[in-house]
Each structure stands twice: as structure tokens, then as C-alpha cells.
């Protein structure tokens, strides 16, 4: 039986204890990270996370050992690549991923490296005077030409598609054009929390879209709650306001006197009285006394009482239609 070095046993045990001691364990790739940037990242995470580099075999053994007590944690071994490291933290794995992604910096193209996204040479002046580089640009498919004594690119051109290797010639041209298509930083491949492993694609969140989706869901839930008269802290004011509006419209159109409707009903009755007097005066001028004639001649132009009632009724009908539409929208969104 081969002898196992004591330091290896100690390393596996220490890694095992760290895995068990933190809520979140991440597996990262530190390949090609400059020492200065790695040191800076360690300092940034000093109070919230621990980065521990080790050999692949020792990390695998530690994860396997911890997997006997923590379900599924050993599956992190499947995501080891490059120069592996374990990251231990108690912060949310999505927050950890965002911190690491935000810390990445642009880097020049390297021959053989995989393009993370489409690499585009943009339209415009390259800054180069006419010379051999024109042929080199055209050789790799870039639509370059001479214009006003400068080499310009006619239109945006994709030289390497996402997921493809960067050819040596393309890498050289990109460097000369000062295009840095790669990123250097701690590459978190997966994170373990509460028996669940989150891969990088899951941890990648479009914050603007997520916020927009949450706002939309809240708005739809709010509309449904208001129209279904479900009382919550957020909907109570709207439900009460809606009930008050309906009560007011009912009281007004049914001529029920309240502190809110009395003034309007008196104004309505007064307008109706003047309209009746005007109609009577047209038939028989003597049917209206001098006081009423004076009021008729001085009254301001105003809508007829019937029109007022119709307006209130129309507003109520419009409100009902809007509420039905909002309720339908809310139900449709929640139940597909």
C-alpha cells in the first residue's frame, strides 16, 4: 500500500472541516489570474469569504469525505477545471457570483482561448496609416479599406463567434487594434447551498429583467387583490377608496343626502329648478315671477341635470369596465 504524505491527510481534513463549517461552498477556476489581482480579490472578500487553493485530487477527496454528511456536496467535483480553488462563505451564492463577476477585468486575446462572446471588430477608423496591416485585416475577413489616408473598417465584423477558439492571427490583430475580448478574474463554476448545487448559468441573473418581472408580478397581483377584494396591507387603501367612490356615486344618483353629497344634490336640484322654470317661461311668460326671471337671465351656462346624471353614470360604467379589465389581466397572468 502506497504511503500517503502526512501533509496531504492534513490538507484533506482541513478542507473537509471548512466545507462543513460554511453555509455556501463554491468551486472556482483561478487559471490565468495575475497574482496582484488575486491578492486584491482576497482582500475584498477577506471579511466575507475564504479562498483556498489546493490540488484537484485533494479537493475531490475532501468533497467526497464531506459528501458522507452533506448531501450532494461531492458533486462540486464535476465542475473542477483549470486551477481549482474552493471558496467558503456564508453569503448568498448569487451575491458571491455577482461580486466575483464585477471584479473581472478586460484582457487581451490569447491564441487558443475560447471566446466568451462574439468578438466584434467595430466599424470606423483603426488609427493605422496605409500599410501591410491592411492586407492582414482583409486576410482574416475584416472589411478594411483606405479612406482619407487612414485604414478604416467599413462595418462591424464578427471575427470569432462565442464558444470558438481564437486563431493566432486573429489574436495578433485584436491586440494591435487594442481590442480586449477576454476577462480575467475568479471564475465561479458552481456553488453549493442547502443540498443544492447552482451552476454558473443559474447564478447569472439579468438584474434589470428580474426587477422588471418582479414589478410586473406585483402590479398584477395588486390589481387582482383589489378587484377580488382581498385585504392586505398594500391593497387596503385602494379597496377603501374604490368602495368610497362607488358609495358616493350611488348616493348621488339615488339622491341620498350625506355630508359629501348634500351640496352637490342641492346644486343639482337648483339647476333642475331653473331648467323647469325656463321651460315654463317659454310656454307662458307669466308662469314665472320676476325673481325667477332674474335668476334665469343671470345664471351661468351649466350642463342640464340629465347630462350630469349621465356623466356620473358613465364614469361609474367606465370604472367598472377598467376594473374588469384589470381583474382579467391579473387572472390571466397568474393562471396562464
UniProtKB/Swiss-Prot annotation:
Designated name of the protein: Large ribosomal subunit protein uL10
Domain of life of the organism encoding this protein: Archaea
Compositional bias ranges of the Acidic residues kind: 307-327
One GO MF term: large ribosomal subunit rRNA binding
GO biological process: cytoplasmic translation; ribosomal large subunit assembly
Record key words, sorted: Ribonucleoprotein, Ribosomal protein, RNA-binding, rRNA-binding
Gene Ontology cellular-component annotations: cytosolic large ribosomal subunit
Keyword Kinase among UniProt keywords: no
Free-text function comment from the UniProt entry: Forms part of the ribosomal stalk, playing a central role in the interaction of the ribosome with GTP-bound translation factors.
Region: Disordered, residue numbers: 292-336
InterPro entries assigned: Ribosomal_protein_uL10 (IPR050323), Ribosomal_uL10 (IPR001790), Ribosomal_uL10-like_insert (IPR040637), Ribosomal_uL10-like_insert_sf (IPR043164), Ribosomal_uL10-like_sf (IPR043141), Ribosomal_uL10_arc (IPR022909)
Gene3D superfamilies reported for this sequence: 3.30.70.1730, 3.90.105.20, 6.10.140.760
Family: Belongs to the universal ribosomal protein uL10 family.
Subunit structure: Part of the 50S ribosomal subunit. Forms part of the ribosomal stalk which helps the ribosome interact with GTP-bound translation factors. Forms a heptameric L10(L12)2(L12)2(L12)2 complex, where L10 forms an elongated spine to which the L12 dimers bind in a sequential fashion.
Amino acid at each position: 500500500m502506497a504511503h500517503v504524505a502526512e501533509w496531504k491527510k492534513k490538507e484533506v481534513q482541513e478542507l473537509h472541516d471548512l466545507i462543513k463549517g460554511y453555509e455556501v461552498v463554491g468551486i472556482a477556476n483561478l487559471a490565468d489570474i495575475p497574482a496582484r489581482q488575486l491578492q486584491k480579490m482576497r482582500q475584498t472578500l477577506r471579511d466575507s469569504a475564504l479562498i483556498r487553493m489546493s490540488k484537484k485530487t485533494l479537493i475531490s477527496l475532501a468533497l467526497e469525505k464531506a459528501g458522507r454528511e452533506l448531501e450532494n456536496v461531492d458533486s462540486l467535483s464535476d465542475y473542477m477545471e483549470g486551477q481549482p480553488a474552493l471558496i467558503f462563505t456564508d453569503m448568498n451564492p448569487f451575491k458571491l457570483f455577482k461580486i466575483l463577476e464585477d471584479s473581472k477585468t478586460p484582457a487581451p486575446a490569447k491564441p487558443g482561448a475560447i471566446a466568451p462572446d462574439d468578438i466584434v471588430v467595430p466599424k470606423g477608423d483603426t488609427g493605422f496609416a496605409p500599410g501591410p496591416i491592411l492586407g492582414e485585416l482583409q486576410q482574416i475577413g475584416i472589411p478594411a479599406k483606405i479612406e482619407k489616408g487612414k485604414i478604416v473598417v467599413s462595418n462591424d465584423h464578427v471575427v470569432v463567434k462565442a464558444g470558438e477558439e481564437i486563431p493566432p492571427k486573429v489574436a495578433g490583430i485584436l491586440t494591435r487594434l487594442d481590442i480586449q475580448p477576454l476577462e480575467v478574474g475568479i471564475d465561479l463554476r458552481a456553488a453549493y447551498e442547502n443540498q443544492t448545487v447552482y451552476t454558473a448559468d443559474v447564478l447569472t441573473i439579468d438584474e434589470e429583467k428580474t426587477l422588471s418581472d418582479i414589478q410586473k408580478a406585483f402590479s398584477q397581483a395588486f390589481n387582482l387583490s383589489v378587484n377580488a377584494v382581498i385585504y392586505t396591507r398594500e391593497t387596503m387603501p385602494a379597496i377603501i377608496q374604490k368602495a368610497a367612490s362607488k358609495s358616493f356615486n350611488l348616493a348621488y344618483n339615488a339622491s341620498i343626502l350625506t355630508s359629501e353629497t348634500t351640496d352637490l344634490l342641492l346644486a343639482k336640484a337648483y339647476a333642475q329648478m331653473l331648467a323647469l322654470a325656463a321651460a315654463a317661461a317659454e310656454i307662458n311668460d307669466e308662469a314665472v315671477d320676476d325673481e325667477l326671471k332674474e335668476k334665469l337671465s343671470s345664471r351661468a351656462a351649466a350642463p342640464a341635470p340629465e347630462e350630469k346624471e349621465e356623466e356620473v353614470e358613465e364614469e361609474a360604467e367606465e370604472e367598472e369596465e377598467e376594473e374588469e379589465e384589470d381583474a382579467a389581466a391579473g387572472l390571466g397572468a397568474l393562471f396562464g
